[in-house]
């Protein structure tokens, strides 16, 4: 639908002749002097021009700069976004290039790929609410706190975090990943660091994670060195047994592996046996991708099995019966190899970290909103949804209060469009200084003020794994089957304010909610391959969930009522769409033991509101059975 004409290198006498405000000036206006461009003419009436320029009043020169059509879209180079390089003296906080969109990327790709009618796996929402999850990396576990009210006690930063940001918030689950080297007495652990770890990880709203054993900082170099060492160690081992190996195959290995001298190989083997041989644990290097060393702890040589499986096994040994590590929280550059990713799968845990999403006055663009993760071989590394305090404090060197500005990112990624869940991600060293601790507490207070559905960090990672694995099969007009979705239980339809779930032709659907012009459809985790059917919006024929703080499952419609399981954190607030003025009896049981019974009446709008109640913290992971029974009688 387009024809390319001449290149226009000089544009001083050109001006914008057409501009679609829904597409252009999204985050930044075009400069007064237009960038050079390839002149393009539409030759299909179905092509929609969103931006065009012409020379003076010569209409024949008009060139399309941004267009969409039935076969795709086109945007001229230089007209999509503004970007600069960072200054050489830029700090860790503002060292990124400035970047802002001229075009609206959401609108551009919506029209380019005609996605309005396409169901989208959604990773921001569960049971109609924005997801909340939190995780803490173990860095700074043993740091002696400088927080005023604890300074004289010699208390560790980890215990301050336990007392101030974990124990007082049983309604907000958190995943804690210690560095095993901070706890293991053979490394740098002691009885006190172990005691604090056991106290933290025993809490029922705390999920156990691992932040590795030695806290690798430069995963890329370590992975390369590990491959090299494996080849060299194999050569050294077998050459001592068979002389012919050294005489015939050693030159071959030397060529392909670039092996070190015999003395260096012996020193490496000695370092394996001697913990004090720290200088032999890694190759010498002065600077590694922003870090002055390869690992935080170089007491022993790098061992991928120890970093992943070993750290998980050690932390599992600190947990109460029935509890296990669920998540590997990547360290350092977070640029892991496929072998590292595979090790997490072999250990039976999810993974998270990387991404560093910011959207605030310092990083004022959707460009700094990171993707869900990255592909590593046949695996996916799951990114954290928000950045941690490192990027706000210049790697914990200044502006210790800076993490309080996370709230700006949380607001910008929720409105005008929800693009990320609420993720509170920080380190144990936030318990070291007063302003750092206060920043975390302010973010926790903000979380309590919001309408959220709290989940654990490993549950969020499972949701994103489901995004990557899900298969959506169209099985009819406005009807789809969702397969292989792992932990993902929300499907979103955009531009859908006039559509609704067709309950008679759907299976395994719990509820729906209209929000920001999109329709969020909640799926039942207990149904393996749910079916979603849509119809034009009209009053529903069955009660359905609008939103809930607690995720629910195993929904069954039974005569004049329904039953389901629910589990969550904090007050179990829920809203259901029913008949106007309908009266319900709500019964709650834990196993076969009745817990609570109450009555609630729907409003004139048919919305039934009730709260199951604060769950005892000791039962935070145990589901309850809920029955809704409509009863006769006037309210």
Residue ranges of each PLM-predicted region?
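Catalytic domains of cell-wall/extracellular-matrix polysaccharide-remodeling enzymes
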Residues: 188-189, 299-378, 437, 606-613, ...
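Alpha-helical scaffold elements lining the catalytic groove of polysaccharide deacetylases
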Residues: 216-320, 372-414
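Non-catalytic C-terminal accessory domains or segments of carbohydrate-active enzymes
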Residues: 454-635
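Short, surface-exposed beta-strand/loop micro-motifs that present aromatic residues
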Residues: 59-73, 123, 410-414
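Extracellular ligand-binding/catalytic regions of CAZymes and related secreted enzymes
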Residues: 68-177, 434-465, 531-562, 567-568, ...
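An acidic, glycine-rich "communication" segment
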Residues: 1-59, 487-489, 495-497
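C-terminal domain-boundary segment and adjacent tail
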Residues: 108-128, 160-179, 184, 205, ...
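Active-site beta->alpha N-cap acidic-glycine motif
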Residues: 95-219, 233-242, 246, 301, ...
């Amino acid at each position: 639908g387009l024809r390319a004409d001449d290149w226009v290198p000089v544009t001083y006498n050109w001006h914008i002749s057409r501009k679609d405000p829904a597409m252009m000036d999204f985050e930044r206006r075009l400069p007064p002097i237009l960038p050079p461009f390839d002149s393009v003419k539409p030759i299909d009436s179905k092509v929609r021009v969103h931006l065009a320029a012409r020379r003076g009043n010569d209409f024949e020169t008009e060139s399309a700069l941004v267009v969409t059509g039935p076969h795709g879209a086109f945007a001229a180079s230089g007209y999509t976004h503004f970007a600069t390089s960072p200054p050489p003296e830029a700090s860790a906080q503002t060292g990124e290039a400035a970047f802002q969109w001229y075009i609206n990327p959401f609108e551009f790709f919506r029209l380019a790929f005609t996605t309005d009618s396409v169901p989208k796996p959604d990773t921001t929402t569960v049971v109609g609410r924005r997801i909340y999850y939190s995780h803490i990396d173990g860095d700074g576990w043993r740091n002696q706190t400088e927080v005023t009210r604890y300074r004289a006690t010699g208390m560790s930063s980890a215990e301050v975090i336990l007392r101030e940001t974990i124990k007082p918030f049983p309604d907000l689950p958190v995943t804690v990943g210690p560095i095993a080297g901070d706890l293991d007495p053979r490394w740098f652990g002691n009885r006190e660091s172990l005691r604090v770890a056991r106290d933290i990880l025993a809490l029922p709203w705390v999920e156990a994670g691992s932040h590795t054993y030695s806290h690798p900082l430069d995963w890329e170099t370590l992975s390369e060195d590990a491959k090299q060492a494996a080849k060299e160690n194999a050569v050294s081992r077998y050459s001592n047994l068979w002389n012919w190996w050294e005489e015939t195959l050693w030159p071959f290995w030397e060529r392909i592996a670039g092996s070190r001298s015999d003395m260096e190989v012996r020193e490496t083997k000695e370092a394996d046996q001697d913990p004090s041989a720290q200088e032999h644990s890694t190759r010498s290097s002065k600077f590694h991708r922003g870090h002055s060393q390869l690992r935080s702890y170089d007491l022993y040589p790098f061992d991928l099995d120890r970093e992943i499986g070993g750290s998980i096994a050690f932390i599992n040994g600190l947990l109460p019966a029935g509890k296990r590590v669920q998540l590997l929280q990547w360290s350092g550059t977070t640029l892991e190899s496929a072998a590292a990713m595979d090790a997490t799968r072999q250990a039976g845990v999810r993974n998270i970290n990387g991404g560093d999403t910011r959207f605030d006055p310092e990083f004022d663009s959707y460009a700094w909103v990171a993707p869900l993760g990255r592909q590593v071989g046949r695996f996916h590394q799951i990114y954290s949804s928000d950045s941690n305090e490192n990027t706000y404090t210049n790697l914990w060197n200044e502006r210790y209060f800076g993490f309080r500005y996370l709230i700006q990112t949380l607001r910008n990624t929720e409105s005008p469009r929800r693009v990320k869940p609420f993720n509170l991600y920080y380190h144990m060293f936030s318990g070291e200084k007063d302003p750092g601790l206060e920043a975390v507490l302010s973010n926790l207070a903000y979380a309590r003020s919001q309408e959220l559905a709290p989940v654990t960090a490993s549950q969020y990672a499972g949701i994103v794994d489901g995004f990557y694995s899900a298969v959506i099969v169209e099985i009819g007009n406005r009807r789809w089957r969702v397969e292989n979705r792992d932990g993902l239980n929300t499907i979103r339809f955009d531009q859908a304010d006039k559509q609704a779930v067709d309950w008679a032709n759907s299976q395994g659907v719990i509820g729906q909610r209209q929000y920001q012009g999109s329709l969020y459809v909640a799926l039942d985790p207990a149904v393996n391959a749910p079916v979603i059917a849509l119809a034009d919006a009209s009053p529903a024929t069955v009660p359905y969930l609008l939103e809930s703080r607690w995720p629910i499952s195993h929904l069954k419609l039974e005569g004049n009522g329904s039953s389901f399981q629910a589990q969550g954190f904090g007050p179990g607030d829920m809203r259901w769409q029913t008949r106007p003025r309908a009266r319900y009896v709500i019964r709650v049981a834990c196993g076969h033991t009745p817990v609570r019974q109450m009555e609630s009446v729907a409003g004139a709008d048919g919305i039934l509101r009730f709260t199951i109640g604060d769950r005892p913290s000791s039962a935070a992971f145990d589901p309850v059975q809920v029955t809704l029974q409509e009863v006769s009688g006037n309210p």
